Amino acid sequence: MAAAANSGSSLPLFDCPTWAGKPPPGLHLDVVKGDKLIEKLIIDEKKYYLFGRNPDLCDFTIDHQSCSRVHAALVYHKHLKRVFLIDLNSTHGTFLGHIRLEPHKPQQIPIDSTVSFGASTRAYTLREKPQTLPSAVKGDEKMGGEDDELKGLLGLPEEETELDNLTEFNTAHNKRISTLTIEEGNLDIQRPKRKRKNSRVTFSEDDEIINPEDVDPSVGRFRNMVQTAVVPVKKKRVEGPGSLVLEESGSRRMQNFAFSGGLYGGLPPTHSEAGSQPHGIHGTALIGGLPMPYPNLAPDVDLTPVVPSAVNMNPAPNPAVYNPEAVNEPKKKKYAKEAWPGKKPTPSLLI
């Protein structure tokens, strides 16, 4: 396999050596700047990893001006079970601790050793997979009381530094898994290209009528709002005096509706009022020699206009019998008995 070009006009190719193999799981680099741990780089998936400024050609990008585009290569030896670092003719060099490496010469990197690239202040420390089992307890005094505590730790390291190291490693491992899952999913799932069938504007020659009432005058504009109902009509009676009687009786009922007897229209006349004020037709009485209708205290509302009846100003003299006893007796009013709704007439309880 070939790598990309380095700085300068020459284009050296990195050929993967035949002794390169896949590293053991959990092998990683701790990236430290000063006293702060920045990140962990997992290096257990490939035979070799490239470092440099070119993000398209390198596995790990070094964002520093002193580094070359393809600066160095980290290779795992499958027979020696060791990691080797190769400088790819960089301008400012690759360092193992404070020792600068010779170009194109593999150099073994022991575990827990630190390397750096160019003038970058970031240090890369080679680490193995953190041990999840607790370290052996030294001394017979700690065996009794701390066994329960060690069981409660569930395989976590005792020291806080080791615990932080394990946490960072798990975080980097999970981040790599999520990245690989997304990349593999993008490779497997190919989005189908969207086909544009009707990308051009076409005009139809046929005219489509949306509102037929604008074209056809026989079609009504409000045809959807019209409802049709069939009402059967009774047969009319034969023309004759009988038909006139029905019409006259209906008109008389409408005319006599307004001239009801009123509140006291249904009361029988008293003995004193029988002779002096006889009732006329349709609730009228002679008051002061003039026929006047009783006032209706609760008239019904009728929407049809009622023609008022003409009052005769010169009535004919009423041949009523004059009774002098009725004049001297005091007049008494009679009130209608109130009828309770739902009350049934019961015989008097008094015997």
UniProtKB/Swiss-Prot annotation:
Chain positions covered by the region annotation Interaction with CDC5L, SF3B1 and MELK: 1-142
Keyword DNA-binding included in the entry's annotation: yes
Motif (Nuclear localization signal 1): 185-209
PTM sites of type Phosphothreonine: T161
PTMs per UniProt: The N-terminus is blocked.
Segments for region (Involved in PP-1 inhibition): 191-200, 331-337
Region (Disordered): 316-351
Protein name from the UniProt record: Nuclear inhibitor of protein phosphatase 1
Species name: Bos taurus (Bovine)
Name of the gene: PPP1R8
